[in-house]
């Protein structure tokens, strides 16, 4: 069977960047990585209803900078910034350095694979038919300017005895093209029949489009002067 590699991991360094940007000595690397994982788990747990798309972690000299991409920044900030202050203190205890938090708004959540996958998972938990949820998500994403969308759901769909996989695609999703800007994410829906996995691929266009070949200049005919 053909297996598909993670489109985001395959494009790191080409069209995508790392979500953790820092340097550490060999003896400190494992501790720093563990801190990053703990911070991400903490943020995902605390900001479950804030539509968080991506979390970037940077470590300048003796402090940390965390960039949270969210479709609902007001939920994270809270009244008069109270929520974000408490969050900053909690993260500082985990990372043991001063932390600066920046929130960036996701203006088009329909073009974000993580938010689309979580939205479908929430609909499945509310017992919405999986085909209706997939088609509605695909139409909304294409309406916002995506060139192609593919959605796959796996599990006991509709309460069936045997688990299966269903997928729906519109447009083109060129997974083999490295310059293609493809966003990919997964989510899980916890239903009464078990867990249903959701995968979303969104093709937004080509980042490094090939330059059109210059047309060969036609040889210019020069008129010789008649003596």
From Swiss-Prot:
GO BP term, example: translation
A GO-annotated cellular component: cytosolic small ribosomal subunit
Keywords noted in UniProt: Ribonucleoprotein, Ribosomal protein, RNA-binding, rRNA-binding
GO molecular function, one term: rRNA binding
Keyword Lipid metabolism attributed: no
PROSITE patterns associated with the record: KH_TYPE_2, RIBOSOMAL_S3
KH type-2 domain location: 39-107
Subunit structure: Part of the 30S ribosomal subunit. Forms a tight complex with proteins S10 and S14.
Family membership: Belongs to the universal ribosomal protein uS3 family.
Role summary: Binds the lower part of the 30S subunit head. Binds mRNA in the 70S ribosome, positioning it for translation.
Listed name of the protein: Small ribosomal subunit protein uS3
């Amino acid at each position: 069977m053909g297996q598909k590699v993670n489109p985001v991991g395959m494009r790191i360094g080409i069209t995508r960047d790392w979500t953790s940007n820092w340097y550490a000595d060999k003896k400190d690397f494992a501790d720093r990585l563990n801190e990053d994982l703990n911070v991400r788990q903490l943020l995902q747990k605390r900001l479950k209803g804030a539509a968080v798309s991506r979390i970037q972690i940077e470590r300048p000299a003796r402090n940390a900078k965390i960039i949270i991409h969210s479709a609902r920044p007001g939920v994270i900030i809270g009244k008069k910034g109270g929520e974000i202050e408490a969050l900053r203190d909690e993260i500082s205890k985990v990372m043991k350095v001063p932390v600066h938090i920046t929130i960036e708004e996701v203006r088009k959540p329909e073009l974000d694979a993580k938010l689309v996958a979580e939205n479908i998972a929430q609909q499945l938990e509310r017992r919405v038919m999986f085909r209706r949820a997939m088609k509605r998500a695909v139409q909304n994403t294409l309406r916002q300017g995506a060139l192609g969308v593919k959605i796959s759901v796996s599990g006991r769909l509709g309460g069936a005895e045997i688990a299966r996989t269903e997928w729906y695609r519109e447009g083109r999703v060129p997974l083999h093209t490295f310059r293609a800007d493809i966003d990919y994410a997964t989510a899980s829906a916890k239903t009464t029949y078990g867990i249903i996995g959701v995968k979303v691929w969104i093709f937004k266009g080509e980042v490094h489009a090939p330059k059109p070949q210059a047309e060969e200049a036609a040889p210019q005919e020069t008129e010789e002067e008649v003596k």
